[in-house]
Amino acid sequence: MADFRKEGRPCPIAHRGCMEAGPENSLTAFEEAAALGAGGVEMDVRRTRDGKLVVFHDADVRRLTMGWQGPYSSGKVKDMTWEKLSQVRLPFGGHLLKRFPEGGYSNEKQYYYPWAVAPEQEVLYQMERFESRAENEEQVLSAVYRRYKEEYERRCLEDGRLERILSLREFFQWLRTQPEGFFAEVELKERGIAGAVIQMAEKCHAADRCIVFSGMDEVVWEIQDWCRSHKKPEGLRLGANIRFLKDEQKEMLDRGDFYEVGLNAGSFGSEEVEYLHQKGIQVFSNLGDTPDWWEALDHLEVDGFKTNCLGQYRKWRQKWERK
């Protein structure tokens, strides 16, 4: 196994790139992650209506386009052609994660609150209202849009910077330009694309820099089955975001070829890490951007951790080392 831990520390992995610097899953976010010393990035893959593989997390583009008044500012990725999706622009204004509370982020949903367009206490109050009344995340998003539409538009115009959505090919081409050892966790967000993603990685000579995984069981096994029935590209690694390590997950791991698994921050300890290491499986922590958890990771011998707050982690690490 590669040694992700350096000087007794876990490898920081920028979740969707550095969201403090650019829209998530954008080239700016990925480039800043590399510049800040991340060991790798986590990114997401979906497929357009006409079969183009693209780098995008959400099923719908709306959350990341708030404030931008161009064409196709809402709609599902799977219903849009690449010609249309490539015209979508992702604004910086109002969308960067500049806030870091004193105790960090213990609630994953709060990363995506509209911190950049309203005062903190108002955001907390309004989001509590929206979430208590909504039946799903789409309704929460609609409420945010109605409440803060004009403010997003103002921030977007003031900042002026825009990014576009990357194709998977473009991402792999960028990945190959990074220093040796820099890697990507490639998360598949839907069924039916495993073979195409793996073949694209091989064609772009980026397979040895990739860990292909999913948090959806059916997609995890699609990845595993494809690699069993085809020749797995040299150097390609497979993973799964299992979140917790219980008997069900242990049985699953015994049946597949797993290089790495993701566990939710706070859901595991040294016993789980040791169990997985004995099986030759690397352990990555899913987020948990709190100083207390960052400190705990050093002692748990976790191999890597995904973070939405790479810049803040770097500041914390520098301060910690001066103690």
Residue ranges and their predicted role:
Residues M1-K323:
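Phosphate-group recognition and catalysis centered on beta-loop-alpha active-site segments
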